[in-house]
Amino acid sequence: MTQLTDTSLIPFDLLEIQKASFKWFFEEGLIEEIENFSPVIDLRGNFEVHFYLKNYELEAPTFTLEEAKQRDLTYAAQLYIPVELRDLETGIVKQDRIFFGEIPLMTDRCTFLINGVERVIINQIIRSPGIYYSVNTDEQGTRTYDVTIISNRGAWLKFEVDKDDLIWMRIDKTHRLPCHIFLKALNLSESEILSALTHPEFLQKTIYEHGDCTEEEALIEFHRQLRPGEPPNSIQGRYLLYSRFFDPKRYDLGFVGRYKLNKKLNLNVSPNIRILTTQDILEILNYLINLQFGMGQIDDIDHLGNRRVKAVGELLQSQLRIGLNRLERLIHDRLSMLTTKSFKKRKKLTTLINAKPINECLKEFFGSSQLSQFMDQTNPLAELIHKRRLTILGPGGLSRDRAGCAVRDIHPSHYGRICPIETPEGQNAGLVGSLTTHAHLNQYGFIETPFYKVEKGYIQKELGIIYLTADEEDQYRIAAADVLINETNKIIGEDISVRYRQEFITTKIDQIDFIAISPLQTFSVSTSLIPFLEHDDANRALMGSNMQRQAVPLLHAEKPLVGTGLEFQVAKDSRRVLINKSEGLVKRVTGDHICIQTDTGKEINYTLIKYQRSNQDTCITQRPIVFEGERVKKGQILADDTATDKGELALGQNLLVAYMPWEGYNYEDAILINERLVYEDVYTSIHIEKYETETRQTKLGIEEITREIPNVNEYSLRNLDEKGIVSVGSWIKGGDILVGKVAPKAESDQPPEGKLLKAIFGEKNRDVRDTSLRMPSGEKGRIVDVRIFIREFGEMLYPGANTANTIVRIYIAQKRKIQVGDKMAGRHGNKGIISKILPRQDMPYLPDGTPIDIILNPLGVPSRMNVGQVYECLLGWAAEHLGVRFKLIPFDERFGKQASRTFIHEKLKEAKELTNKNWLFNSNHPGKIQLFDGRTGESFDNPIMVGKAYMLKLVHLVDDKIHARSTGPYSLITQQPLGGKAQQGGQRFGEMEVWALEAFGAAYTLQEILTIKSDDMLGRNEALKAIVKGKAIPRPGIPESFKVLMRELQALCLDVVAYKIQNGDQDECEALAIDLSGSLATPIDNIIKEVIQQEELGEELTS
């Protein structure tokens, strides 16, 4: 019997990277950063401030997570630190417990709640601190080497060899200095320097060229190079040298930098020494000189051994460091004003140490950093993938414009660490990636991937999983997981393809060192959910991976007939399903509540999430999947989410699909669907929109929420309660009032009779205007929730809401059925737009009368090379008839040639025999069936491929995109209609569209589009009047954009004027009355008229 390598589920939580990093921040990162900061000494040396961080305290957030979300607040804990202030002259000590800022807390779903919005901190992958040797080749083919020492904090140091074999040293890529001057400035004698080198004669050339010098001369030269404007001085030179490379507060190699330096140069320096030592510098130089003699290796900067991941904890630590630097300056300023006398009087230290700089830094990071993103909550998979994302962008990383192809490319060291498939399609291709399923971060932030040890062809599973980093892996011969093994865990076969030193080679099985633990470990989570992935082209697999994240959760979730086995873990690790905490018996189950009685008799109550709005307006709700009296285990799923089915990820529906053309309706990836999908709510989804209004104190008085709205009939107020707020459960259409609100109107200049009436009858109430919140046009739905916050009742509201007295939030749920224009896709990148919904009687049908659900174009398969959809479709067809579901791990060719095809044929034959439906499988046309036209009842000429495909409805819904405009707002400068649905904009008639009308010869249509339908202000008003009065539309005038062009040319000091030719005499010209400035005639116009009268007719005018 043969079996595969162990393909059990991933051995750890998929969100471990986020959780572990945040935990590290509180246990180590925070303490380390403030210990480096403490003590702060007054510049006069009189006072000293100590921070005792090991005794820090975190106070629980004021509000629960749910309350903070409703009030648009940040879910954060308050940090308090014991502080000690010492007077160094008198020895008096004062202690206090100081508030040190609010630190946002990670929720159990690994997100942060910032101002009521869930956000995710994504992981940044950056060049690791350490040492990098590189080679440069000039046009003549001369090779020169250089070395860069990258620190975690502080200046970059570089040594380079020029084509004359002289060694130079650079600081921060600018200041250049002969290398031996730098060494002499470090107080090293010539004998010490030369004895440390393997080839001392190479450096002697540099010393001979520039001349020897003493330590003092070297320091003077060092100062001259770094501060060219100042008089050179050896004392200042020594201070500059110390502060640049040997002051722990200014220069820090970091834990990782020291590790990389020790590893590359075989040093044994303590990990706690994080500054450069003279031993480091001599070894760095020795290695550089050895490269000139062909000894040693240069470094590949794109290798993952030289790139590390900064997860959330480290990013927070960097941000805290910026805040502490600002705080230090503040403390110095406050200490400079402190005297011994005022110190004795001071009871509290709170005025001395203000948490504002730290708070501002953290707010800035969480609110506006490139690495803090609005969480993608479209479905559970999108949420999970967002937290496992890696980016090269962000502070300290690269920018989109500077990133070349080398950075974006797939590197051999990415194997098992960064997914080669999942990346965005646009500008960010290759810059944003995703961690693979089994990837894991080590203590230094390098990505590791798991393997089993192999001894003499036997897999040593009993030794457990061994994690290797990219540079460790290069030393071994590593086999992929898709090899066959027998029951004794011995690899079958003689010659096996392995990876060795970033190349693929063939080797004997007894020479294999390690084997991958799963074929899925090369890919990210969403790519691992694609069945038959090995049969898809990578470009289409990329689209399939990305589109699964855009799938809208449906009303009735259905798990796929054909999956990969990862669906359960993705659903569980996304934290969107409800997981049982303790073994016991289900005591009570309702729609929103589950009660479990544990074996000890204790009751655990779980409250389900019901109809909550996600960041993308999709619906988050939980459904119980256990029943009363059922025995449940710890870790068992108790309730499903909107996009899970029995605890498995369920993003779409299994549909009966036929690959055939149908009357041209599925041309260019269009899709035909059966009306059954509409009537039976197969693809119906729920979307929840939020609308908000607030009452404010204006100059003219306070706004008021009321039912008494001027000039509004009773029918428009039908859904409002006595307060003027819409009732929960009401059905609302576009234009309906959600919240009745009035604002005071300014008193207009009253006519004399008005003043007389006022004088007789006294002060009358001022007019109010209608400022009600209304439903936008084209929208409809049912009110599911109304929330009111009133300041008088002490409701804490979000920052910035200080001027609001009342805030009303309305949540409206919409049921969106599938319709023409919606986008659908499979898991293999096969996407399309619905072009027609056919009556079920018109759909092609099977020999047993079953109508097809969806018709796809067969031409979408061959050129796209995503044949996986064909395999999935046929295996799903077999699964349907056998009453089973299949879980397949990709790369099954290890079982033999054409393994997928053979397996599917076997299953189809089995289904045929089990159901006695002989038409299910025909060996002459395997996978194809004779279909009949629903309109005529006749069979089609050729057999057609029919099967069960798993299709998703994507978030690009036509309801959100379709838009029409009759009249609307115009741009202030160009006077053209605005663009976009949100601005009630028009359709852009661009350059190419103009060409199309020109080619067609539609002159009048084109003129109307460019003038009265766009920016001819006078013309469009006249046209509207003419349409209203039923008269002929007048001829268009001059578009505003022409006037803008004229003004721009005049701004360049070009006296450009437009003329029109009169209808009478062709030779006579007069200035065209274009009012550019608001006045009819300008001085320049009068001058031109005089010139025209004086000059001879037909003579060319020059201005």
Curated annotation (Swiss-Prot):
Q: Does the keyword Transferase apply?
A: yes
Q: Which GO terms describe its biological process?
A: DNA-templated transcription
Sorted keywords for this record are: Cyanelle, DNA-directed RNA polymerase, Nucleotidyltransferase, Plastid, Transcription, Transferase
User: Which reactions are catalysed by this chain?
Assistant: RNA(n) + a ribonucleoside 5'-triphosphate = RNA(n+1) + diphosphate
Q: Spell out the subcellular localization from the entry.
A: Plastid, Cyanelle
Q: Can you name a GO cellular component term?
A: cyanelle
The keyword Transcription is assigned to this record: yes
- Molecular function (Gene Ontology), one example: DNA-directed RNA polymerase activity
Gene3D superfamilies linked to this entry: 2.40.50.100, 2.40.50.150, 3.90.1100.10, DNA-directed RNA polymerase, beta subunit, external 1 domain (2.30.150.10), DNA-directed RNA polymerase, subunit 2, domain 6 (2.40.270.10), RNA polymerase alpha subunit dimerisation domain (3.90.1800.10), RNA polymerase Rpb2, domain 2 (3.90.1110.10)
* Disulfides per UniProt: none
Q: What is its EC number?
A: 2.7.7.6
Q: Which Pfam families match?
A: RNA_pol_Rpb2_1, RNA_pol_Rpb2_2, RNA_pol_Rpb2_3, RNA_pol_Rpb2_45, RNA_pol_Rpb2_6, RNA_pol_Rpb2_7
Q: Which InterPro entries match?
A: DNA-dir_RNA_pol_bsu_ext_1_sf, DNA-dir_RNA_pol_bsu_external_1, DNA-dir_RNA_pol_su2, DNA-dir_RNAP_su2_dom, DNA-dir_RNAP_su2_hyb_sf, RNA_pol_bsu_bac, RNA_pol_bsu_CS, RNA_pol_bsu_protrusion
NCBIfam families, per database record = PRK00405.1, rpoB
Similarity-based family: Belongs to the RNA polymerase beta chain family.
Quaternary arrangement and interactors, per the entry?
Answer: In plastids the minimal PEP RNA polymerase catalytic core is composed of four subunits: alpha, beta, beta', and beta''. When a (nuclear-encoded) sigma factor is associated with the core the holoenzyme is formed, which can initiate transcription.
Q: What is this protein's function per UniProt?
A: DNA-dependent RNA polymerase catalyzes the transcription of DNA into RNA using the four ribonucleoside triphosphates as substrates.
Q: What name goes with this protein? A: DNA-directed RNA polymerase subunit beta
For this protein's source organism, the top of the classification is: Eukaryota, Glaucocystophyceae, Cyanophoraceae, Cyanophora
